[in-house]
Amino acid sequence: MTMEKKRYFSVMSEDRSPNLVTAEQNEELKNSSVSKDSQEDSLFVVDDSDIEEQTESNILENTNPVPHVHRLEYEEFESQIKSVVGTISSHAMNHLFKKYHDKQNYLKLAVQEYLQGIDENDTDIRIVGNSPDGNNSPNVHRKRIYEQEQDDLMSRLQRECQRSQDEEKKKSWNRFIGSLNVQAWATRPTTKPLKYLEKLELRRLMPKKLNVGKPTKEKTKFGDSSIIRIYTIPKYTEESGREIGRIPEDITRILVPLIDLDISSFYTTVMIDTEKRLSTGDSFYIQIDCYLSQNAFSGKELERSMSQSDQDLNALKRQKKMDTRTRFDFSTETNTEAILRLRQYSLSRFFQRLNIKPIPQKSDHADDINEASETPIIIDSENEDDHIVKEDHEQQNLDQLKQIMQANQQSELLDSLPETTKPPIFNFKLDLRKYQKHGLSWMLTREREIAVLETLSKNDDDDNDNDILTTQDKANIQERNDAFMNPLWDIFEWPKDTSMHKSESSPTEDRMDDNYFYANMYNGELSLTKPVIRSMVKGGILADEMGLGKTISTLALINSVPIDVMFEENKELEDKTIYASKTTLIIVPMSLLSQWQKEFDKANNNSNHKCFIYYGDSATTDLSPVLCNKKKDIPIVMITTYGTVLNEFTRISNRRDAKGFLPKIGLFSVKFFRIVLDEGHNIRNRTAKTSKAIYEILSNRKWVLTGTPVINRLDDLYSLVKFLELEPWSNFSYWKTFVTLPFEQRKISQTLDVVKSILEPIFIRRTKNMKQSNGKPLVELPPKEVVIEEVKFNEVEEKLYNWFKARASQSFKDGIKSGDLFKKYSQILTHILRLRQVCCHVDLVGSANEMEQELVDPNTDLSEANGESDSISMVNNVLDSYHADNNHDEKFKNNTEVRSVMFPLYEKIDLKESECSICTQSPIPLGEMALTPCGHAYCLNCVLEHFDFQEKNSQKPLCPNCREPISKYKIFKLRHRDTSVKEIRFHTKQEMEDPSQNFKFQLYLYDPTKTSSKIQCLINHLKILKEQSPNEQVVVFSQFSSYLDIIENELKIQISNDFVVYKFDGRLNMNERQKILENFSSQKHENKVMILLLSLKAGGVGLNLTTASRAFMMDPWWSPSVEDQAIDRLHRIGQNSNVKVTRFIMADSIETKMLKIQERKKQIGEAVGAEEDERRKRRIEEMQILFEDD
């Protein structure tokens, strides 16, 4: 027997009238939690004008409990059903959705059928309807019973839902944030005056229609309408209150988004009685008490908005790449982007109005930073008659940047670290200074070696109990090291509640104990918990000032933790990269390669610790056998150069596999335990090939050593952050959004605050002028004296300089006048180059040297500069013109006359008995001796000064001994070279006393047009130094190696017997450099001055030249920091003597103007200008300084 499965419930057919539900049930459903049209106790009201415009049909249409829904989304349908009936099976939900989603009363019909009965075990969901004679059926009685049960169940569900909402509302809270005193105005007359402390209500106006009667081209966006009106509070709840006024537009625009996003609530109180009832346009004063709601701190809506914004942005970028010719406006703001923008704008202005300021980060330098941002600087106007006082923003920027570099020195983390940490004695044999021990503690915490730190800090002989780490100290260190506050967030303190309205929904007692909250003013996000960034970076930036021993500090770290003890030997990583867990790779400039090896050998106290120098040999294409074998001779340190890394990367960069990985060759064949970049600012350009190569090398821990982390611009720091893989800042789009763009928009203080927060956990810098905790200097160095000595042009130099200066000034004036100065940029730079060459030596003019590359902008057109290729001929023309203007009698007519005068002088020279009749020096050194045609010997400097004295007095120069007329163009000098007697006899036709004896010197004609005033001053200083300190070691700095060549030749000619000269420049290979430095530092020559001619490019950084205490700077550079770095090669740890530096500057020349530019750079900072246009503008200003009239 077949049985049909039935449910004995009455079922509503699809064509059944919706009026089956009673009026009472309809009213209950209308007021239930699922109704969306309820406006009771809401800030959102309908514009009165819109209400008046509504037609009768619109009003009747709005009386429906639920609006007609077309193609309702399944998720919304499901959530509404579950909110009424609770849990429901998926196939039952699908049945209800398919059947009712397009019905007018879909919710009521679906709930009614479900409650009447669906057999959820029956997949066909068969429903038995009424029989034709249903009116006489016994089921009619059952139907009425179940309808009554349905009504009871619906009422119970509604009460439960309301109770749940009430409980949720009680759990939520509002907290007082401040009050606004506002002058409002009346929009309509009032029936009576307003009373003091009378309560009013703010309501956000939500018009139903926008642009009435006009076609709308685009979708209405969030926040398009900003209208807030003031209403009276009705005495009875069934009344709606009456509009009486409005608040100012600027405040409205701030409050509207806060209301729309349910961030804040506002309570209004009348503050001053109105003497009479208000008329339209009258003003009255109110106080708006402002509260932040719990919803403001949830962040869910903001996260969804940001996520959607990112998706929209990515989609737009993809679309833009697909069709670059489209006319679509990619700058169009999406609705979610508008929400974020309005939230950020409203909160920032809201806090500004309420005078809510963040609590400064704890730093001893915070006051200094604030002072730097508030102190006005008085500067001179270009117009002498117009003296004004203005704020020098650039000076503030530099001051703040300097404070940022030092602010972390007094951070809580650093203060909690011991100052007694030192490496194990069996690994490291040098003694560290106190600040180096403290720095080692910080470096160990950055590598998360807390256990090692605890062990090594107890090994100090002082046994200072105060430096022993407690359990709490270790926990605090771990917490600060692993998680630091997000730098985009600020901490705020809740203000005291001084409102006129005491909120009934104030925070709970446990929440009241929390006196602080956090805000991200970049996107308007709020939080009650400290927003932290979990950092996995093991490493940091050691930015101690030059000369404080960054090399020793790094070697101390390596010897404290030489290997990765947590790694199982020979275990491969997930990406199949071999892990060199026992080797630290140190990448250095080539000039420092031997010095690092030497420092390692000096510090190493473990015979098993080896240092390996890697040259990129073809024999070591795979480093895994060398660094990952099971033998004991694995080097703990491998040193290589930036050039080696670049060469290897260039060879293999085009051989990436399908996944983009480089082939496992050379430095890229293993993952190192640790990487150290010495002079890390070499990778400051993130787009340079060297930087890209460095980024590709894998390691577990990374360190950057640099004394100058910022050189040209603030973005120099980004490359260091990218190398360290500091998330999220290593993502350039993130860095650009929060650092680069705000900085370019001149939001300096805001940007530097972000940079300070980024650097604080990974950055440490100590300077020589810092004090220790006991008040003593961080490091006691001998005094340093820098002296500027102005040198005057000689006659020929002055003539040539003035000729080039006239051409340069004219080009500059023409460029200014025509407005195309940038087009003449390269030409003007070439003129500046010529002027600097003349200041150094006239032979440099037109020479191919590195000055050309330094001064000419590589991005400019060099076509005009190439016209200067015939500079040598121009110099000769100028010199010929000079000679033509002078008396021909002062010079020899030809070489025959020169020989006829010079060769007879050989017999008159007695080197041992020679004496200068001007200064009485005897004997006269061979290199200094000068002879007149009459055969009298003098010191060259003495006779030249004699010429100058005679010319100043308008007298004809005469020989001091015989009073014969003499000329500076008829002076002979001596040099170390043998001269044959036969040659002399051939020219003189005279018999010699001893024809077999050759002369040990050679005479030659002195040419004053080929001398350099600077070189002559240098030689004079060296001669004096030889007399005062015969065994002195001297360093001579110059920017240009070709100039050093000329200096070397002059020194060999004039003073070669008393001096030992070495030259160190970029043309030397590594072995030659090492040999020169060893000879200069270690070899001693009795009674001889040792001179090192040093190019700043090759040896301006990293070298240790503490054996020398005297230095001469032959030419200035645009950047003062370059010269400071050079001087610090001498004035550093290990220097025991007073350091004296002499800077030679040509008087009344471009070099004196360069000193002004250097001072200007010190004042405004070299990292202030971020945009290329801004930097170009600064260069033009510097050119104006160079060409201004004295």
UniProtKB/Swiss-Prot annotation:
SMART domains: DEXDc, HELICc, HIRAN, RING. The keyword Coiled coil does not apply. ATP binds at D544, E545, M546, G547, L548, G549, K550, T551. It is an enzyme of class 3 (hydrolase). Residues 1017-1181 form the Helicase C-terminal domain. One of its GO terms (cellular component) is cytoplasm. Its main location: cytoplasm. This is DNA repair protein RAD5. It comes from Debaryomyces hansenii (strain ATCC 36239 / CBS 767 / BCRC 21394 / JCM 1990 / NBRC 0083 / IGC 2968).
